[in-house]
Amino acid sequence: MKITFSPELSIPCEVCKNQSNGYHFEVLSCGACASFFRRSVVSKIKYQCKDGKKRCQIRYLDRHFCRYCRFSKCVKAGMKAEKIQKNRDLDSSPTPTDQNNCIPSDVLHDDGILIKDIRGLFKQFNPHNASEGCSKLEKLTEGLQFIRRNQERECIKIIDEMDSESLKDVQFKVIGSCATWLLFSSFFQKLEENEKVVILERLWHGWTVLEFLSRSLEIFGNKVIDEKIVFISDNTAIRLITAFENSLKTASPKKSESIKKKLELSFSVIFDELALHFINWKPTEIEISYMQWQIVWSVAEQLLSGNSLEKGEHFTEQLSKDLHEYYVRELKLENYAFRIEKMMDIVQIVQNNFY
């Protein structure tokens, strides 16, 4: 008998063994357990074990969980309460810090200023070209194709240095690309402007790593790892480590050493971990879009609440169903657990290092 695995069933929830739909609070889990954990932390609920032994089995097939043991299992699995924004003031939400930026703030321009310049895009851009009748995941993939539509594949300029103004221009363009891609999500389109802005502000660093790296590996292959080359625009790539070493020549020895230490860790993650995962697997555009949304949701679920949070959970669950249909109907795969595991590995590396 032929057996197919949905993306959720191939990797079960670490709490209740139900269908997982991505990482929540750093644990691969289902939406129900993630919501339960969030409610418990925000409401500061103190549970009592149903039978007093504190060893109850947590299985999704059971109608009534022991809430004490379910919460304990969430914590034991690795869910972190500090990942929950208990007072969700979106307008005053802090920007990402050096600890989780792929490039330190010593090097980057103020992304808050750049994002304010992009606010108008949320009002003006409407991805009307998204095909009618296609799935939500296919629409996100159309968005990926849209922001890559002018990608050069032959006449590529490779540079070894970049001045401050050029870096600012790259930042502005990539934040714009991230915002544009997000608008291919029907869920994101309907969010309030302040919700969109704060998600974009928190998101773009890690999103950029995955976008630039996947695009670069598709065209350059192993040269990305060997020469540390990545695209920074449609027709320009940069030898990343060489360029930053050159840019630090005029800095004071103390500042130069400080920035180098911060960059070395990020570059190691990008080239020694993420790039190798891609090279050994070669994901499709559909899979890249799915991974990007998993990263989006890991940020957004910490910031949203109420109706927005609920709709986002439904949208994310639908993407998992769309991915299953893609594997079964398009790729004709009987067992795609390997591909799901690869995607989740990449998503977790980005989450752990850039957020």
Curated annotation (Swiss-Prot):
Pfam families according to UniProt: Hormone_recep, zf-C4
DNA-binding region: 10-86
Family: Belongs to the nuclear hormone receptor family.
CDD domains, A to Z: NR_DBD_HNF4A
Name listed for the protein in its UniProt record: Nuclear hormone receptor family member nhr-127
Superkingdom: Eukaryota
GO MF, any single term: zinc ion binding
Keyword vocabulary terms for this entry: DNA-binding, Metal-binding, Nucleus, Receptor, Transcription, Transcription regulation, Zinc, Zinc-finger
Lineage of origin: Eukaryota, Metazoa, Ecdysozoa, Nematoda, Chromadorea
Source organism (scientific name): Caenorhabditis elegans
Zn finger region (NR C4-type): 13-33, 49-69
Gene3D superfamilies found in the cross-reference section: Erythroid Transcription Factor GATA-1, subunit A, Retinoid X Receptor
Annotated function: Orphan nuclear receptor. May play a role in modulation of lifespan and immunity.
SMART domains: HOLI, ZnF_C4
Description of what induces expression: Transcription up-regulated in response to intestinal colonization by probiotic Lactobacillus fermentum strain JDFM216.
All residue ranges annotated as the NR LBD domain in the record: 126-355
InterPro entries xrefs: C.elegans_Orphan_NR, HNF4-like_DBD, NHR-like_dom_sf, Nucl_hrmn_rcpt_lig-bd, Znf_hrmn_rcpt, Znf_NHR/GATA
Location(s), subcellular: Nucleus
A GO cellular component entry from the record: nucleus
The keyword Metal-binding is annotated on this UniProt entry: yes
Gene that this sequence comes from: nhr-127
